[in-house]
Amino acid sequence: MAFVSNGTERDADEEGFEDAYENIPVASKMDLRCALEECTLALNLFLNNKFSEALEILRPWAKESIYHALGYSTILVMQSAMTFEPQDVQMGISTMKEALQTCQRFRKRTTVVESLSNLVSKQSGDQLTEEEMHAEICYAECLLQKATLTFVQDENMINFIKGGMKIRTSYQIYKECHQLYSLAVTQGKTCSDTHHQFEGGVKLGIGAFNLMLSLLPSRVLRLLEFIGFSGNREFGLSQLREGASGNSIRAILCVLTLLFYHTYISTILGTGEANLEEAEALLEPYLKKFPNGSIILFYAARIDILKGRFEQAQETFQKCIVSQQEWKQIHHLCYWELMWCHSFQQDWLQAYRYADLLCKESKWSKATYVFQKAAILSMLPDDVVKTTGEDIVALFRQVEGLKQRIAGKSIPTEKFAVRKSRRYASDNPVKLTLPALEMVYVWNGFTIVGKRPDLTENVLVTIEKAEVALQSEKNPSEYHPDDLCLVQLLKGVCLKHLGRLLQAELCFNQVIQSEKRVKYDHYLLPFTFYELGLLYKDQGDRDKAIRYIETAKSNYKDYSLESRLHFRIHAALSSLKGSPVSTPSTPQ
């Protein structure tokens, strides 16, 4: 492994960066231009891991300037979202409420008559000052963040409805701001720097809303369209790309939104076909500007994972960890990724160590972390498990008591973990079969491991050993048919990524033929139909691919991880129906 700096040696560029911002004077007045300049300084500090210094710049004017209010509250909201501590969430909500009040003071005041007239004829840009236009954008951003925190804070239905209304209001404001910007373009009024900054805000909001809404399964989107929402993926991406290529304060936010889409959404909620070339191109200038920025390093490492460069990713995650000590939550994100990195390589002992760190330090999803730790330990020989001092059965029995609710709903992966853990509730527990590899599949990790044929072959060997063990059991348990189907699904996925499509098809069909024997893991059937559909897509049989994926969509309901599969189905069908497969793809 290459040497990773412990943080005591710093580049001259970084020291120069700190010197430049060390003695930033407090402004005596704060107009829009000055606010944007000062908030840009704060943003640069934030991206260079100087989180407290960024807050110190923003705090003095947080109740007097819309951009200071937005920046200050956004950092606190990010912090609360990562810690999940109730007091941090409450602080984030309180600060965001103050930010909304600040933005409200700068918004155009309208009478009842003016408000009614605007329903018929939207107000033009001439009716708003530049400051009022920016106040609208900042208000919409604050409203969206407050709605998100409202869901996290309390699970009651009233808060859920309030949060939904805030999101809808935010969406409507963005649409109106987009109309204002379009009008300004036609009138040739977009030359000033502040107008370009407004443009950046519009592209971020409209782009993010369109992109995220386009990801939703059609049945959900139809309902949202009824109440005024709409989402166009290509339009959303184009808006974010334009925003990312600009020089506004929100350019980096457009970049981070695109990076999150390419490196997480496309993998976990999509088919795994991420545009990593664009992700690398977007990140490159920021890696040069902030070579030790933890957020930038994190995404660089994530891209390495998705490219199958696990060893390089591990080094970059370690660099990210030592780059700053103020926000430990970024360390937790790295631990999560490192856990998967080692799992993909079947280095289960190292994977366990990172799962254990998450259990001890992070509050995000204790049920998931404890289940993950127990699942990983289950892959190790008994003598190695003893050296850790852990009790696998006791860990699985803890899971149900750690489950939490957000916005009144249980977290799907936690519900899945609880259901799987119930095998260990009885006095005579029945061991789970390949639980860590099952979780790799749940998180769509085989699309990542599949980039490395050597590792995929190793995983296949592990699966086939489990298959032989199950087939030779003399006293099979009631879970035996489910376990056999799980093994066939995992085996089929490995074979598919190795290009052995006929063998993979046999495995998937074996699961489908065993449908009536499955007692507990009913999710295996729709997921298998989905995988079979993707296999036919790889073979170039578009019609058959659509038919099998539609079967997964329409013929099954009320199974574990249903929403996650529907997101993936939506992505797969959009790809198939939007761009017909003309030639068979080359197996990777």
From Swiss-Prot:
Record's InterPro entries? Iml2/TPR_39 (IPR019412), TPR-like_helical_dom_sf (IPR011990), TPR_rpt (IPR019734)
Q: Which UniProt keywords apply?
A: Lipid metabolism, Repeat, TPR repeat
> Which positions does the entry assign to TPR repeats?
294-327, 485-518, 526-559
One Pfam annotation reads TPR_8
GO BP, one annotated term? lipid metabolic process
Give the source's domain of life in one word. Answer: Eukaryota
Q: Which SMART domains match?
A: TPR
> Which SUPFAM superfamilies is this protein grouped with?
TPR-like
Describe its function. Answer: May be involved in lipid metabolism.
UniProt-listed PANTHER family:
TETRATRICOPEPTIDE REPEAT PROTEIN 39 FAMILY MEMBER, TETRATRICOPEPTIDE REPEAT PROTEIN 39B
Q: What's the family?
A: Belongs to the TTC39 family.
What protein does this entry describe? Tetratricopeptide repeat protein 39B
| Species name | Xenopus tropicalis
Q: Give the gene symbol.
A: ttc39b
